[in-house]
Swiss-Prot record:
Subcellular location: Cytoplasm
HAMAP family in alphabetical order: 23SrRNA_methyltr_F
Role of this protein: Specifically methylates the adenine in position 1618 of 23S rRNA.
GO MF, any single term: 23S rRNA (adenine(1618)-N(6))-methyltransferase activity
Name the UniProt record assigns to this protein: Ribosomal RNA large subunit methyltransferase F
Organism: Escherichia coli O157:H7
Presence of the UniProt keyword Ribosomal protein in the record: no
Entry's family note: Belongs to the methyltransferase superfamily. METTL16/RlmF family.
InterPro entries to which the protein is assigned, alphabetical: METTL16/RlmF, rRNA_lsu_MeTfrase_F, SAM-dependent_MTases_sf
C-alpha cells in the first residue's frame, strides 16, 4: 500500500511510504532495524539513532546516488524528505526571476554539518554548486570525507571553516564571489538545558525512559546558541546587508511561527526589498523558511543571467 505524505513538495521523491524491501537491498544493515507496527506493517525503529542512520544511508544511495555516506556518533542525523523539501522550494524561489530553475546556481549552505545533506540533495536534483560553511572542525572533516568518497562531488561542493566567533557570512563570502542563494538550518534552542529538554520530550514521545541509552544526535553548535533561533537569524539578517549585491536570496529555516514577527521587523530595519515566506509540511510537522533580497525584480533578472 502506498500512502501519500501530506504537504511534501510535488518534486520531492519521498511522497510514498518507504519501499523497505528495496532500501534493504541497497543497504542490508537496515534489515536489523525493521520492526512491526501495531497494525502489523513493517517500519523502521525510529527510536534507534543507528536505525535512522541506516535508513539515511539507503535513501541517499537509492535516490541521490550517494553511495558512501556516514557521520560520526553524536551528530545530527537529518530526516531526508524534509531536507529535500527545502531544496525544492528554494528551486522554485530561484525560478521566479527567469521562469526556469537555474541549472548552474551557486548556493551557500551556512552550517553544512557533518551530514552535508543539503549539498548532496541539491547537486543531484539540480546540478547546483555548493559552498558549505562550518564552525566545527570535526563536522567539516566528516562532510569532506563524504565528498571525497563519492566521485564527482569534489567538483560540485567546497567547504570553508568559519573561524570568526559569532560571524555568519563574514569571512565566508569572499570579495568577488556571487551566490544565487544562501540556506541555513539554524540552532533551535537558546541553552544547553533547553536542548536537553527537547531531547527528553523526544524520548517521551517515543515511549522511552531515561535509562534508554539513546543519542538523538546533535552537537552544541547544531542544537543551541545564545539567544536561540531568533538571535541567530537576526545576526544573519544584520550581516546580510553587507553582501546585498553578492547574494540574490538569503534564506533560513524558522522552526516556530511565533518567531517570525521580530525577524520581519529586523528585515524592515535593514531595508530588505522583498521578503518571502515558504510554508512546508512533512507529515504532521509544519515548517517554513523565510527569504529576503536587497535586489528588485530587474536586478534579480540581471543577476540570474550574469556570466558565471
Amino acid at each position: 500500500m502506498s500512502a501519500q505524505k501530506p504537504g511534501l513538495h510535488p518534486r520531492n521523491r519521498h511522497h510514498s511510504r518507504y519501499d523497505l524491501a528495496t532500501l534493504c537491498q541497497v543497504n542490508p544493515e537496515l534489515k536489523q532495524f525493521l520492526t512491526l507496527t501495531p497494525a502489523g506493517e513493517q517500519s523502521v525503529d525510529f527510536a534507534n539513532p543507528l536505525a535512522v542512520k541506516a535508513l539515511n544511508k539507503a535513501l541517499l544511495a537509492h535516490f541521490y546516488a550517494v553511495a558512501n555516506w556516514d557521520i560520526p556518533d553524536g551528530f545530527l542525523c537529518p530526516p531526508v524528505p524534509g531536507r529535500a523539501d527545502y531544496i525544492h522550494h528554494l528551486a522554485d524561489l530561484l525560478a521566479e526571476a527567469s521562469g526556469t530553475i537555474p541549472a548552474n546556481a551557486s548556493i551557500l549552505d551556512i552550517g553544512v554539518g557533518a551530514n552535508c545533506i543539503y549539498p548532496l540533495i541539491g547537486v543531484h536534483e539540480y546540478g547546483w554548486r555548493f559552498t558549505g560553511s562550518e564552525t566545527s572542525s570535526q563536522a567539516l572533516s566528516s562532510a569532506q570525507a563524504i565528498i571525497s568518497a563519492n566521485p564527482g562531488l569534489n567538483r560540485a561542493i567546497r567547504l570553508r571553516r568559519q573561524k570568526e566567533s559569532g560571524a555568519i557570512f563574514n569571512g565566508i563570502i569572499h570579495k568577488n564571489e556571487q551566490y544565487d542563494a544562501t540556506l541555513c538550518n539554524p540552532p533551535f534552542h537558546d541553552s544547553a538545558a533547553a536542548a536537553r529538554a527537547g531531547s527528553e520530550c523526544k524520548r517521551r514521545n517515543l515511549g522511552l525512559n531515561k535509562d534508554d541509552a539513546l543519542n538523538f544526535g546533535g552537537q552544541q553548535q547544531e542544537l543551541w546558541c545564545e539567544g536561540g533561533e531568533v538571535t541567530f537569524i537576526k545576526k544573519m539578517i544584520e550581516e546580510s546587508k553587507g553582501f546585498a549585491k553578492q547574494v540574490m536570496w538569503f534564506t533560513s529555516l524558522v522552526s516556530r511561527g511565533e518567531n517570525l514577527p521580530p525577524l520581519y521587523r529586523a528585515l524592515t530595519d535593514v531595508g530588505a526589498v522583498k521578503v518571502v515566506k515558504k510554508e512546508m509540511a512533512q507529515g504532521q510537522k509544519q515548517s517554513r523558511f523565510i527569504a529576503w533580497t536587497f535586489m528588485n525584480d530587474e536586478q534579480r533578472r540581471r543577476f540570474v543571467n550574469r556570466q558565471r
